[in-house]
Amino acid sequence: MPENAQVIMRYGPYSSIGLPVEHRTYRLEGLLAVLAEDGHQVLLEKIEDWNVVELMVNGEVVFRCNIKDLEFGGDGKLDPLCREARIAVLNAY
């Protein structure tokens, strides 16, 4: 995948320690940072599927995980899911 690719990050609502279910981006910060570091433009898109994060490149889902499995906050450099997502985007056609 060329650098500066457009990536659509689709994310669903999730519940956090007694708080109501809603769309939050706190757990996406590391993933956003990793993709931005590679020069990708990331568009956020809310979806209704609970606990889901999907990365789409050229209309194809190249990565999917449970949003609760991503580390809360941070730069994403130590999060293995962020590394996996980065590689999936770089390998996308």
UniProtKB/Swiss-Prot annotation:
Pfam families, per database record: UPF0728
Disulfide bonds: none
InterPro entries documented for this protein: UPF0728 (IPR027885)
Family indicated by similarity: Belongs to the UPF0728 family.
Protein name: UPF0728 protein C10orf53 homolog
Lineage, highest ranks first: Eukaryota, Metazoa, Chordata, Craniata, Vertebrata
